[in-house]
A protein has these predicted regions:
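N-terminal metal-binding scaffold of metallo-dependent hydrolase/deaminase domains
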Residues: 1-41, 53, 369-374, 389-390
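C-terminal cap of metal-dependent C-N hydrolases
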Residues: 7, 11, 339, 358-404
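Metal-associated gating/positioning segment near the N- to mid-region
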Residues: 51-124, 141, 196
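Histidine/acidic-residue-rich catalytic or RNA/ligand-binding cores of hydrolases
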Residues: 68-71, 182-185, 222-230, 247, ...
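Active-site mouth loops of central-metabolism enzymes
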Residues: 73-86, 142-159, 211-213
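Divalent metal-dependent hydrolysis catalytic cores, especially in the metallo-beta-lactamase
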Residues: 87-113, 127-138, 169-183, 211, ...
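Alpha-helix-loop-beta-strand connector modules within alpha/beta enzyme cores
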Residues: 118-136, 189-210, 214, 254-259
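His/Asp/Glu-enriched, well-ordered alpha-helical/loop segment
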Residues: 207, 282-367
Length: 404
Protein backbone atom coordinates (compact mmCIF):
# COMPACT_ATOMS: atom_id res chain seq x y z
CA UNK A 1 0.00 0.00 0.00
CA UNK A 2 1.16 3.54 -0.69
CA UNK A 3 -0.20 6.99 0.03
CA UNK A 4 0.29 10.06 -2.15
CA UNK A 5 -0.38 13.40 -0.46
CA UNK A 6 -0.60 16.83 -2.07
CA UNK A 7 -1.73 20.38 -1.39
CA UNK A 8 -4.71 19.76 -3.68
CA UNK A 9 -6.40 16.69 -5.11
CA UNK A 10 -8.66 17.17 -8.13
CA UNK A 11 -10.87 14.11 -8.44
CA UNK A 12 -11.86 14.92 -12.03
CA UNK A 13 -15.49 15.50 -11.15
CA UNK A 14 -16.66 19.11 -11.71
CA UNK A 15 -15.93 21.31 -8.71
CA UNK A 16 -14.57 18.49 -6.56
CA UNK A 17 -11.31 19.69 -5.00
CA UNK A 18 -9.81 18.22 -1.83
CA UNK A 19 -7.43 20.57 -0.03
CA UNK A 20 -4.50 18.83 1.67
CA UNK A 21 -5.69 15.54 0.25
CA UNK A 22 -4.36 12.04 -0.19
CA UNK A 23 -4.88 8.94 -2.31
CA UNK A 24 -4.41 5.43 -0.93
CA UNK A 25 -3.25 2.96 -3.58
CA UNK A 26 -3.00 -0.82 -3.44
CA UNK A 27 -1.11 -2.17 -6.44
CA UNK A 28 -2.88 -0.96 -9.57
CA UNK A 29 -6.07 0.29 -7.89
CA UNK A 30 -7.20 3.29 -5.88
CA UNK A 31 -8.48 2.31 -2.43
CA UNK A 32 -9.59 5.71 -1.15
CA UNK A 33 -9.43 9.44 -1.84
CA UNK A 34 -9.90 12.03 0.87
CA UNK A 35 -8.33 14.58 3.20
CA UNK A 36 -4.96 13.97 4.85
CA UNK A 37 -5.12 11.06 7.28
CA UNK A 38 -8.22 9.48 5.77
CA UNK A 39 -6.29 6.61 4.22
CA UNK A 40 -4.76 5.38 7.46
CA UNK A 41 -1.23 3.99 7.42
CA UNK A 42 0.79 2.72 4.46
CA UNK A 43 4.25 1.28 3.94
CA UNK A 44 5.12 4.07 1.51
CA UNK A 45 4.11 7.72 1.73
CA UNK A 46 4.94 10.30 -0.92
CA UNK A 47 4.31 13.82 0.35
CA UNK A 48 4.13 16.53 -2.33
CA UNK A 49 3.60 19.95 -0.72
CA UNK A 50 2.87 22.69 -3.23
CA UNK A 51 1.63 20.13 -5.75
CA UNK A 52 -1.70 19.14 -7.25
CA UNK A 53 -2.70 15.53 -7.91
CA UNK A 54 -5.30 14.87 -10.59
CA UNK A 55 -6.42 12.02 -12.85
CA UNK A 56 -4.05 11.04 -15.61
CA UNK A 57 -4.75 12.96 -18.81
CA UNK A 58 -6.50 11.32 -21.75
CA UNK A 59 -5.81 11.90 -25.44
CA UNK A 60 -8.92 10.71 -27.26
CA UNK A 61 -7.37 10.83 -30.74
CA UNK A 62 -3.82 9.79 -31.58
CA UNK A 63 -1.98 7.95 -34.34
CA UNK A 64 0.99 6.23 -32.74
CA UNK A 65 1.99 4.75 -36.09
CA UNK A 66 2.67 8.12 -37.71
CA UNK A 67 5.86 10.13 -37.36
CA UNK A 68 4.40 13.66 -37.07
CA UNK A 69 5.85 14.49 -40.48
CA UNK A 70 4.31 15.55 -43.78
CA UNK A 71 2.81 12.79 -45.97
CA UNK A 72 2.83 9.78 -43.64
CA UNK A 73 1.39 7.67 -46.46
CA UNK A 74 4.54 7.91 -48.55
CA UNK A 75 6.93 7.96 -45.62
CA UNK A 76 5.56 5.11 -43.52
CA UNK A 77 4.05 2.74 -46.11
CA UNK A 78 7.40 1.09 -46.99
CA UNK A 79 8.29 0.65 -43.31
CA UNK A 80 8.25 -2.92 -42.02
CA UNK A 81 5.80 -3.83 -39.28
CA UNK A 82 8.73 -4.67 -36.99
CA UNK A 83 10.25 -1.21 -37.37
CA UNK A 84 6.89 0.54 -37.20
CA UNK A 85 6.05 -1.18 -33.92
CA UNK A 86 9.25 0.22 -32.40
CA UNK A 87 8.27 3.68 -33.65
CA UNK A 88 4.85 3.29 -32.06
CA UNK A 89 6.44 2.27 -28.75
CA UNK A 90 8.61 5.39 -28.76
CA UNK A 91 5.59 7.58 -29.54
CA UNK A 92 3.73 5.95 -26.66
CA UNK A 93 6.65 6.69 -24.33
CA UNK A 94 6.61 10.35 -25.38
CA UNK A 95 2.87 10.52 -24.84
CA UNK A 96 3.01 9.20 -21.28
CA UNK A 97 5.94 11.53 -20.57
CA UNK A 98 3.47 14.40 -21.11
CA UNK A 99 1.14 13.03 -18.44
CA UNK A 100 -1.20 11.12 -20.75
CA UNK A 101 -2.12 7.83 -19.05
CA UNK A 102 -4.78 6.71 -21.54
CA UNK A 103 -4.98 7.30 -25.27
CA UNK A 104 -7.28 6.18 -28.05
CA UNK A 105 -5.39 5.17 -31.18
CA UNK A 106 -7.78 5.78 -34.06
CA UNK A 107 -6.01 4.15 -36.94
CA UNK A 108 -3.24 1.63 -37.31
CA UNK A 109 -2.27 -1.02 -39.82
CA UNK A 110 -1.71 -4.70 -39.23
CA UNK A 111 -3.24 -4.66 -35.73
CA UNK A 112 0.03 -3.26 -34.40
CA UNK A 113 -1.84 -1.06 -31.93
CA UNK A 114 -3.16 -4.23 -30.30
CA UNK A 115 0.35 -5.64 -29.96
CA UNK A 116 1.59 -2.43 -28.35
CA UNK A 117 -1.48 -2.16 -26.10
CA UNK A 118 -0.90 -5.66 -24.76
CA UNK A 119 2.86 -5.14 -24.35
CA UNK A 120 2.26 -2.03 -22.24
CA UNK A 121 -0.31 -3.83 -20.09
CA UNK A 122 2.14 -6.69 -19.56
CA UNK A 123 4.89 -4.28 -18.53
CA UNK A 124 7.09 -4.95 -21.57
CA UNK A 125 6.89 -1.34 -22.77
CA UNK A 126 6.32 2.07 -21.21
CA UNK A 127 3.28 4.02 -22.29
CA UNK A 128 -0.34 4.87 -21.57
CA UNK A 129 -3.25 2.47 -21.64
CA UNK A 130 -4.32 2.23 -25.29
CA UNK A 131 -7.91 2.08 -26.52
CA UNK A 132 -7.27 0.58 -29.96
CA UNK A 133 -9.47 0.98 -33.04
CA UNK A 134 -7.15 -0.97 -35.39
CA UNK A 135 -7.99 -0.52 -39.11
CA UNK A 136 -10.31 2.39 -39.93
CA UNK A 137 -13.25 1.39 -42.11
CA UNK A 138 -13.16 3.40 -45.33
CA UNK A 139 -14.26 3.18 -48.96
CA UNK A 140 -11.95 1.70 -51.58
CA UNK A 141 -9.26 4.31 -52.16
CA UNK A 142 -10.78 6.44 -49.40
CA UNK A 143 -9.22 8.31 -46.52
CA UNK A 144 -6.55 6.07 -44.88
CA UNK A 145 -7.26 3.17 -47.24
CA UNK A 146 -3.65 2.00 -46.82
CA UNK A 147 -4.36 0.80 -43.27
CA UNK A 148 -6.31 -2.14 -44.68
CA UNK A 149 -9.95 -1.39 -43.83
CA UNK A 150 -11.49 -0.81 -47.27
CA UNK A 151 -15.20 -1.68 -47.56
CA UNK A 152 -17.83 -0.32 -49.97
CA UNK A 153 -21.09 -2.07 -49.10
CA UNK A 154 -22.87 -3.63 -46.14
CA UNK A 155 -21.37 -7.14 -46.37
CA UNK A 156 -17.85 -5.76 -46.73
CA UNK A 157 -18.34 -3.33 -43.85
CA UNK A 158 -19.59 -6.10 -41.60
CA UNK A 159 -16.63 -8.27 -42.57
CA UNK A 160 -14.00 -5.61 -41.77
CA UNK A 161 -15.77 -4.64 -38.55
CA UNK A 162 -15.98 -8.25 -37.40
CA UNK A 163 -12.35 -8.91 -38.28
CA UNK A 164 -11.28 -5.89 -36.26
CA UNK A 165 -13.39 -6.98 -33.30
CA UNK A 166 -12.18 -10.59 -33.55
CA UNK A 167 -8.60 -9.34 -33.40
CA UNK A 168 -9.38 -7.49 -30.16
CA UNK A 169 -10.33 -3.93 -31.14
CA UNK A 170 -11.59 -1.80 -28.25
CA UNK A 171 -13.69 0.36 -30.57
CA UNK A 172 -14.30 0.85 -34.28
CA UNK A 173 -13.25 3.82 -36.42
CA UNK A 174 -15.08 4.75 -39.61
CA UNK A 175 -14.24 7.43 -42.15
CA UNK A 176 -17.59 9.14 -42.70
CA UNK A 177 -15.94 11.83 -44.83
CA UNK A 178 -12.78 12.31 -46.81
CA UNK A 179 -9.67 13.74 -45.21
CA UNK A 180 -6.56 15.80 -45.65
CA UNK A 181 -3.63 13.41 -45.98
CA UNK A 182 -4.47 10.58 -48.39
CA UNK A 183 -3.41 11.33 -51.97
CA UNK A 184 -6.21 10.67 -54.46
CA UNK A 185 -8.89 10.16 -51.78
CA UNK A 186 -12.10 12.21 -51.54
CA UNK A 187 -11.59 15.67 -50.02
CA UNK A 188 -12.55 16.43 -46.45
CA UNK A 189 -15.83 18.10 -47.45
CA UNK A 190 -17.04 14.97 -49.30
CA UNK A 191 -19.15 12.30 -47.59
CA UNK A 192 -17.87 8.71 -47.85
CA UNK A 193 -20.73 6.83 -46.13
CA UNK A 194 -24.38 7.67 -45.60
CA UNK A 195 -26.43 7.04 -42.48
CA UNK A 196 -27.46 3.47 -43.30
CA UNK A 197 -23.93 2.18 -43.85
CA UNK A 198 -22.66 4.04 -40.80
CA UNK A 199 -25.43 2.37 -38.82
CA UNK A 200 -24.02 -1.01 -39.90
CA UNK A 201 -20.72 -0.11 -38.23
CA UNK A 202 -22.54 0.95 -35.07
CA UNK A 203 -24.53 -2.31 -35.03
CA UNK A 204 -21.41 -4.44 -35.32
CA UNK A 205 -19.63 -2.52 -32.57
CA UNK A 206 -22.66 -2.67 -30.29
CA UNK A 207 -22.88 -6.44 -30.74
CA UNK A 208 -19.58 -6.64 -28.83
CA UNK A 209 -20.35 -3.83 -26.40
CA UNK A 210 -18.09 -1.35 -28.21
CA UNK A 211 -18.48 2.19 -29.48
CA UNK A 212 -17.72 3.89 -32.80
CA UNK A 213 -15.60 6.93 -33.58
CA UNK A 214 -16.53 8.62 -36.85
CA UNK A 215 -14.06 10.82 -38.72
CA UNK A 216 -16.34 13.55 -40.07
CA UNK A 217 -15.38 16.92 -41.54
CA UNK A 218 -18.30 17.47 -43.94
CA UNK A 219 -21.69 18.74 -42.80
CA UNK A 220 -23.52 15.72 -44.26
CA UNK A 221 -21.02 13.32 -42.71
CA UNK A 222 -21.43 14.89 -39.26
CA UNK A 223 -25.21 14.61 -39.47
CA UNK A 224 -25.15 11.02 -40.75
CA UNK A 225 -22.68 9.95 -38.06
CA UNK A 226 -24.92 11.31 -35.32
CA UNK A 227 -28.05 9.82 -36.91
CA UNK A 228 -26.30 6.44 -37.02
CA UNK A 229 -25.54 6.55 -33.29
CA UNK A 230 -21.76 6.81 -33.16
CA UNK A 231 -20.21 7.46 -29.76
CA UNK A 232 -17.85 10.23 -30.90
CA UNK A 233 -17.51 12.50 -33.91
CA UNK A 234 -13.88 13.25 -34.71
CA UNK A 235 -12.80 16.68 -36.03
CA UNK A 236 -16.33 18.03 -36.68
CA UNK A 237 -14.90 20.95 -38.64
CA UNK A 238 -18.04 21.82 -40.67
CA UNK A 239 -15.81 21.79 -43.74
CA UNK A 240 -16.91 22.98 -47.19
CA UNK A 241 -14.91 23.56 -50.39
CA UNK A 242 -14.41 27.16 -49.21
CA UNK A 243 -13.35 26.30 -45.64
CA UNK A 244 -15.05 26.22 -42.22
CA UNK A 245 -18.76 27.12 -42.32
CA UNK A 246 -20.25 26.62 -38.89
CA UNK A 247 -23.87 25.43 -38.94
CA UNK A 248 -25.71 26.36 -35.74
CA UNK A 249 -28.69 24.12 -36.52
CA UNK A 250 -26.42 21.13 -37.08
CA UNK A 251 -24.51 21.94 -33.89
CA UNK A 252 -27.78 21.95 -31.95
CA UNK A 253 -28.61 18.57 -33.47
CA UNK A 254 -25.28 17.17 -32.29
CA UNK A 255 -25.71 18.66 -28.82
CA UNK A 256 -29.25 17.31 -28.42
CA UNK A 257 -28.05 13.81 -29.33
CA UNK A 258 -25.49 13.75 -26.52
CA UNK A 259 -22.81 12.57 -28.94
CA UNK A 260 -19.28 13.42 -27.88
CA UNK A 261 -17.13 15.51 -30.20
CA UNK A 262 -13.34 15.38 -30.29
CA UNK A 263 -12.34 18.48 -32.28
CA UNK A 264 -8.68 17.36 -32.36
CA UNK A 265 -7.43 20.63 -30.91
CA UNK A 266 -3.64 20.68 -30.73
CA UNK A 267 -0.83 23.09 -29.93
CA UNK A 268 0.40 23.15 -33.52
CA UNK A 269 -2.37 25.67 -34.20
CA UNK A 270 -0.20 28.48 -32.82
CA UNK A 271 2.63 27.73 -35.25
CA UNK A 272 0.07 27.51 -38.04
CA UNK A 273 -1.00 31.04 -37.20
CA UNK A 274 2.59 32.24 -37.57
CA UNK A 275 3.18 30.45 -40.87
CA UNK A 276 -0.25 30.59 -42.53
CA UNK A 277 -1.88 33.69 -41.07
CA UNK A 278 -4.64 34.12 -38.48
CA UNK A 279 -7.75 33.55 -40.60
CA UNK A 280 -7.91 29.75 -40.48
CA UNK A 281 -6.96 29.54 -36.80
CA UNK A 282 -9.43 32.22 -35.74
CA UNK A 283 -12.21 30.52 -37.69
CA UNK A 284 -11.48 27.22 -35.96
CA UNK A 285 -11.27 28.81 -32.50
CA UNK A 286 -14.62 30.46 -33.14
CA UNK A 287 -16.07 27.09 -34.16
CA UNK A 288 -14.77 25.38 -31.00
CA UNK A 289 -16.19 28.20 -28.88
CA UNK A 290 -19.53 28.01 -30.69
CA UNK A 291 -19.77 24.25 -30.14
CA UNK A 292 -19.27 24.84 -26.43
CA UNK A 293 -22.02 27.46 -26.40
CA UNK A 294 -24.30 25.01 -28.21
CA UNK A 295 -23.82 22.51 -25.38
CA UNK A 296 -21.84 19.91 -27.32
CA UNK A 297 -19.82 17.59 -25.10
CA UNK A 298 -16.27 18.21 -26.31
CA UNK A 299 -13.26 16.13 -25.26
CA UNK A 300 -9.51 16.52 -25.58
CA UNK A 301 -7.67 14.81 -28.41
CA UNK A 302 -4.75 16.03 -30.48
CA UNK A 303 -4.52 13.89 -33.66
CA UNK A 304 -0.89 13.47 -32.56
CA UNK A 305 1.37 11.86 -35.13
CA UNK A 306 -0.20 13.66 -38.08
CA UNK A 307 1.53 16.79 -39.37
CA UNK A 308 -0.86 19.72 -39.75
CA UNK A 309 -0.24 22.26 -42.50
CA UNK A 310 3.29 20.91 -42.78
CA UNK A 311 4.05 21.32 -39.05
CA UNK A 312 4.90 18.35 -36.83
CA UNK A 313 2.22 17.40 -34.27
CA UNK A 314 4.24 15.33 -31.79
CA UNK A 315 2.84 12.95 -29.21
CA UNK A 316 4.46 14.89 -26.36
CA UNK A 317 2.70 18.18 -27.20
CA UNK A 318 -0.58 17.39 -25.46
CA UNK A 319 -0.71 20.37 -23.09
CA UNK A 320 -0.49 22.80 -26.02
CA UNK A 321 -3.85 21.51 -27.20
CA UNK A 322 -5.43 22.19 -23.82
CA UNK A 323 -4.11 25.75 -23.96
CA UNK A 324 -5.95 26.22 -27.25
CA UNK A 325 -9.20 25.36 -25.47
CA UNK A 326 -8.37 28.14 -23.02
CA UNK A 327 -7.96 30.57 -25.91
CA UNK A 328 -11.40 29.49 -27.14
CA UNK A 329 -12.92 30.59 -23.82
CA UNK A 330 -12.88 27.45 -21.71
CA UNK A 331 -12.11 27.77 -18.00
CA UNK A 332 -9.30 25.73 -16.49
CA UNK A 333 -11.61 23.52 -14.43
CA UNK A 334 -13.64 22.70 -17.52
CA UNK A 335 -10.48 21.90 -19.47
CA UNK A 336 -9.34 19.47 -16.76
CA UNK A 337 -12.76 17.83 -16.95
CA UNK A 338 -12.74 17.40 -20.74
CA UNK A 339 -9.19 16.02 -20.54
CA UNK A 340 -10.00 13.45 -17.84
CA UNK A 341 -13.41 12.20 -16.74
CA UNK A 342 -15.31 13.36 -19.84
CA UNK A 343 -12.69 12.00 -22.23
CA UNK A 344 -12.73 8.67 -20.38
CA UNK A 345 -16.49 8.40 -20.84
CA UNK A 346 -16.18 9.29 -24.53
CA UNK A 347 -13.56 6.58 -25.03
CA UNK A 348 -15.69 3.98 -23.26
CA UNK A 349 -13.37 3.55 -20.27
CA UNK A 350 -15.11 5.80 -17.75
CA UNK A 351 -15.84 2.89 -15.42
CA UNK A 352 -12.14 2.16 -14.91
CA UNK A 353 -10.30 5.48 -15.27
CA UNK A 354 -10.70 9.24 -15.77
CA UNK A 355 -11.40 10.16 -12.16
CA UNK A 356 -9.83 9.53 -8.77
CA UNK A 357 -12.15 7.28 -6.81
CA UNK A 358 -12.09 3.95 -5.03
CA UNK A 359 -11.93 0.93 -7.31
CA UNK A 360 -10.60 2.72 -10.36
CA UNK A 361 -7.15 2.29 -11.84
CA UNK A 362 -4.40 4.28 -10.18
CA UNK A 363 -3.90 6.44 -13.26
CA UNK A 364 -2.84 9.85 -11.98
CA UNK A 365 -0.37 12.68 -12.27
CA UNK A 366 1.12 15.15 -9.81
CA UNK A 367 2.24 18.60 -10.92
CA UNK A 368 4.00 21.44 -9.12
CA UNK A 369 1.57 24.32 -8.76
CA UNK A 370 -2.16 24.48 -9.42
CA UNK A 371 -3.54 23.96 -12.95
CA UNK A 372 -6.88 25.44 -11.89
CA UNK A 373 -5.08 28.76 -11.49
CA UNK A 374 -2.43 28.32 -14.19
CA UNK A 375 -3.05 25.71 -16.87
CA UNK A 376 0.62 25.67 -17.88
CA UNK A 377 1.39 24.04 -14.51
CA UNK A 378 0.31 20.78 -16.13
CA UNK A 379 3.77 20.79 -17.69
CA UNK A 380 5.41 20.69 -14.24
CA UNK A 381 5.17 16.93 -13.89
CA UNK A 382 6.51 15.42 -10.68
CA UNK A 383 4.79 12.03 -10.95
CA UNK A 384 2.95 9.92 -13.52
CA UNK A 385 1.32 6.66 -12.45
CA UNK A 386 -0.18 4.21 -14.93
CA UNK A 387 -2.10 1.52 -13.04
CA UNK A 388 0.02 2.35 -10.02
CA UNK A 389 3.35 2.03 -11.84
CA UNK A 390 5.63 5.06 -11.78
CA UNK A 391 6.56 5.94 -15.34
CA UNK A 392 7.70 9.45 -14.44
CA UNK A 393 8.85 10.54 -10.99
CA UNK A 394 11.22 13.37 -10.14
CA UNK A 395 14.52 11.99 -8.84
CA UNK A 396 13.63 8.34 -9.51
CA UNK A 397 14.91 6.01 -12.24
CA UNK A 398 11.64 4.99 -13.88
CA UNK A 399 13.21 3.73 -17.10
CA UNK A 400 14.05 0.40 -15.48
CA UNK A 401 11.60 0.38 -12.58
CA UNK A 402 8.53 0.74 -14.81
CA UNK A 403 9.33 -2.25 -17.01
CA UNK A 404 9.05 -5.65 -15.36
Amino acid sequence: MRIIRAAKVLTGHPGEVIADGEILIDGSKIVSVGPRGSGGDAAEVLDLPGHTVLPGLIDAHVHLGFDAKVDPVTRRSPESDHHLLLRMAENARKLVSAGVTTCRDLGSRGFLDLALRDAIEEGLAVGPHIVAATRPITITGGHCWYMGGEADDEPAIRRVARENLRAGADCLKVMASGGLMTPGAPPSWAQQYGTELLRVVVEEAASRGKGVAAHAHAHAAIRSAVEAGVRTVEHCTFFTPSGHQYDAELADFVADSGTYVCPTVHGVLWRMRESHGPEMLDAWLNTVAAMREAGIRLVAGTDAGFATAGIANRTDGYIGGLEVFAQAGYGNAEIVELATVRAADACGVGEVTGSLEAGKRADLIAVAGDPLSRLADLRNLALVLVSGRSVTQAGVDTVTSSVD
